[in-house]
Amino acid sequence: MSDVTLLRIGIAIVGILFVAAVFFFSTPKTSAHRVRTKKEEPPRERREPMLSTEVDNSPHQSVDEVPASVPQQQVNPEATKPGEIELGKRPTNHFDKIILLFVAAKAEHTLRGEDIVVAAEKTGMIFGYMNVFHRLVEGYPERGPIFSMASILKPGSFDMANIREMQIPAISFFLTLPAPMTALDAWEKMLPTVQRMAELLDGVVLDESRNALGRQRIAHIRDELRAYDRQQQVPPLIKNSRW
């Protein structure tokens, strides 16, 4: 073996040892630096799920941050302001149960105010009480809404004067029981409306837990409402007697 070959082998071995030494001594320092960097970062504030109407007004707010509840003012007829439209107002502030659905924008998108208004009109909803949309009993508007639709951003209303600038992550549909018809009939009117709104707005339908609304959940809701309707049927106090 020539001297040149031995020299090349020696240089290669020294090079390998040098690279290994650099890697060995630099890796712990880098890790320590990363640990210190993480410690120096202030802890992020953890946002707990909200159960109130205090929702951020940011148009890009994620639907995951939306509270699974309905603003109290929307089920309380005593909250009417002077001069406010009362079409869609409930005749009483009593309610037993609320069925809630969402239509949410797809990822990286929002729902535009103008599009919401057009879609609501196409699905037979009327703008009214509390400045939100309602589905009313045809020919009997005084009976109150079958269900209503609101913005998920507080206070839940639609500002028609600035509707062109409105962009929100989702809208909510709520069926307040007792309704002006049986609970199951009200649901059968609400569900296709919500699905059609999602189609018109290119959105997705979510349940009250903000999960995709599937057939199994729909079946469970129907069962719940059938049970509710049975509970509302009061048996006669006195049986008809035979003479």
Curated annotation (Swiss-Prot):
Residues 26-243 are cytoplasmic. The keyword Zinc does not apply. Residues 1-4 are periplasmic. Essential cell division protein that stabilizes the FtsZ protofilaments by cross-linking them and that serves as a cytoplasmic membrane anchor for the Z ring. Also required for the recruitment to the septal ring of downstream cell division proteins. InterPro entries: Cell_div_ZipA, ZipA_FtsZ-bd_C, ZipA_FtsZ-bd_C_sf. The chain crosses the membrane at residues 5-25. It is found in: Cell inner membrane. Residues 38-49 have a biased composition (Basic and acidic residues). It holds the Pfam family ZipA_C. Interacts with FtsZ via their C-terminal domains. Coiled coil: none annotated. GO terms for biological process: division septum assembly; FtsZ-dependent cytokinesis. This is Cell division protein ZipA. Keywords: Cell cycle, Cell division, Cell inner membrane, Cell membrane, Membrane, Transmembrane, Transmembrane helix. Belongs to the ZipA family. Residues 32-89 are annotated as: Disordered. GO terms for cellular component: cell division site; plasma membrane. It is a single-pass type I membrane protein.
